[in-house]
Amino acid sequence: MEAVIRKWQQKFRKGKEEMEKWEALQVRWVSLFRNASSIIQRLQEMQNHGSYGALRCLKGIEDAVVQQQMGQLESLLRSMKNVMEEFWGCVLTFEKLHRDGLQLREIESSKRRVEERIGVKPCITDCLEGLSILYDMHQSEYHLKSSILSVLSCLILKPSPGDLNALQYLVVDQPNIPKDEVQHIFDVIFAEEIK
């Protein structure tokens, strides 16, 4: 039984690596989002002829500035899409870990054995539920981020500072991945390592 639990713990170590990768991606995602939303907020002001003061005497300055900012915004949105692909890779890894966990559970035919505990070690049911929750959390957060990216693209045409602020809160907060719940899962799985 201990050998089986060690296999599960290996899966959770891989999951922890994916979560660290996710967190690094999250830092990039937040930075890209903030930069893109700053440009979106400025675009409306840039299209106001009164904003250029003495620079209005330069022919085409307004169009040039707006074009340059739109180019930067396109680049940021492309980078955000690339980060989304990397987030999706993490989701697929969690899906595979969960699928592998289901196969491991199938090997253990007896219900009693699936719920059996040895000391503080987790039972197989704890392990499978933990992987399932981690997969669901990251998949849900990926879908939220995907929706945020779509909404951000729509806000280019009609920017709203209130909407951008609300989206920024969601981007930073990651509401689908509550840190205390994630920590609890790892505390259960690695209980014997906690000192």
UniProtKB/Swiss-Prot annotation:
One of its GO terms (cellular component) is nuclear envelope. It comes from the Eukaryota. InterPro entries: CA109-like, OPRN-like. This is Uncharacterized protein At5g43822. It comes from Arabidopsis thaliana. The lineage of its organism: Eukaryota, Viridiplantae, Streptophyta, Embryophyta, Tracheophyta.
